[in-house]
């Protein structure tokens, strides 16, 4: 990665002894890029590039869901996977306050607090998985099982 500073997500992966590679992609400073564009920018199939979504349940607890960038979260299935009656996406303005990350740079690893985290089960069929490196412009790639373990996550069918 050269002289670029490591993110909290990268430091956590290293402490967990997870082998990963970091991949930079072009972007305007502070401007989020959609996941399908990110996949194209790093030359990868969108099926192996995952996005991190943050929700709040009817209990007022926060939950993190990680799904392929071209997929849509099934809110009912997501709620069932965490034992909630319902979940709703948090407002974009609350992302930093809740996670410590910015929109477009939200990693499932290294948030301010450890939230219940669920990856879509499709991740298990991927030989490698990309997720945000913890800032806009950086993706990390590693084995799916390693990212799931580092995020202290489970898996479930949570997309349509």
Language-model features: where?
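Extended, low-hydrophobicity, polar/charged segments
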Residues: 1-160
């Amino acid at each position: 990665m050269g002289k670029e500073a490591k993110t909290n997500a990268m430091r956590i992966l290293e402490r967990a002894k997870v082998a990963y590679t970091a991949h930079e992609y072009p972007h305007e400073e502070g401007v989020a890029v959609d996941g399908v564009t990110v996949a194209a920018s790093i030359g990868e199939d969108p099926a192996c590039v995952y996005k991190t979504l943050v929700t709040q349940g009817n209990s007022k607890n926060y939950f993190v869901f990680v799904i392929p960038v071209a997929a849509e979260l099934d809110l009912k299935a997501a709620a069932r996977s965490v034992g909630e009656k319902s979940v709703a996406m948090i407002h974009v303005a609350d992302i930093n306050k809740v996670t410590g990350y910015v929109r477009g740079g939200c990693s499932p690893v290294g948030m301010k607090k450890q939230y219940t985290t669920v990856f879509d089960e499709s991740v298990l069929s991927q030989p490698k998985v990309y997720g945000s490196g913890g800032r806009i412009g950086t993706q990390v790639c590693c084995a799916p099982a390693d990212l799931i373990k580092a995020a202290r996550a489970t898996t479930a069918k949570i997309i349509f």
